[in-house]
A protein has these predicted regions:
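Active-site-adjacent betaalpha module
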Residues: 2-19, 47, 53-57, 83-199
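A short alpha/beta connector and helix-capping loop motif
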Residues: 16, 33-65
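N-terminal nucleotide-binding beta1-loop-alpha1 segment
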Residues: 19-25
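Active-site flanking residues adjacent to catalytic metal/cofactor-binding acidic residues
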Residues: 23, 62, 158
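Short acidic, Gly/Ser-rich segments with clustered Asp/Glu that frequently serve as metal-coordination loops
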Residues: 26-32
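Short, glycine/acidic-enriched loop or turn micro-motifs at the edges of active sites
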Residues: 27, 66, 162
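Short, hinge-like loop/turn segments at secondary-structure boundaries
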Residues: 39, 76-80, 172-175
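Acidic/polar short surface loop at catalytic or gating sites that assists cofactor/ion binding
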Residues: 68-87
Length: 199
């Protein structure tokens, strides 16, 4: 990642240390009894934990909340998925207990699939990002593509992402692999050295 992040031309400033961004590890996407629960979440979370341990506090956790304006197409969306049309403080939208200790920073709460935007950029600046979370085929890919458009350097840890099912996960990973060099698809073993502090 050092070579990919690189030094800016003519600059002696070293690149910023990468951050881990964990997308939406919430009950609604993780619980086996949720209509949107990912069967891949337990295995992916084990890798998320490894990445967070390596990042030494440079971790942001995001949360999707059902607060979008119902006068827009989000109203149609929640009409199609009435089980999810609940108040933002419903336990369905809580971060899963095992993810609450991943980050020392406040959770970034947004009503959009994609989490890339000024709220996130204010915290991490231009640092490279390792992306993980759930679901690969919705909020992860939406975040990754917006990050690519913004000029971010993003590594997707594929085995630290959980799709709605394995086929949809694989399809989303394939799409994200079409966006080098902004997006790089890797696995946890390859992403760990990017996050560990330099000696």
């Amino acid at each position: 990642m050092t070579s990919a992040a690189g030094l800016a031309a003519g600059s002696s400033t070293p690149p910023a240390a990468p951050w881990l961004v964990v997308i939406d590890p919430q009950n609604i996407f993780a619980a086996p009894d949720s209509a949107w629960g990912s069967p891949m979440f337990p295995e992916a979370f084990a890798n998320i934990r490894r990445l967070a341990d390596a990042a030494a506090g440079r971790v942001l956790v995001t949360r999707w909340l059902p607060t979008a304006d119902r006068r827009t197409s989000w109203g149609d969306y929640f009409a199609a998925w009435p089980f999810a049309d609940k108040p933002a403080d419903d336990p369905l939208y809580d971060i899963v207990p095992e993810a609450r200790s991943l980050s020392p920073h406040p959770t970034l709460d947004l009503p959009t699939f994609g989490k890339w935007g000024p709220e996130l950029e204010r915290i991490i600046g231009s640092a490279p990002v390792v992306l993980a979370g759930v679901s690969t085929d919705c909020c992860v890919i939406s975040t990754a593509l917006a990050a690519a458009d913004a000029g971010a350097r993003v590594t997707i840890a594929a085995d630290a992402c959980a799709g709605s099912d394995p086929a949809n996960h694989a399809a989303a990973i394939q799409v994200m692999s079409l966006y080098p060099p902004q997006l790089t698809v890797a696995d946890t073993a390859a992403a760990l050295p990017l996050l560990r502090p330099a000696p």
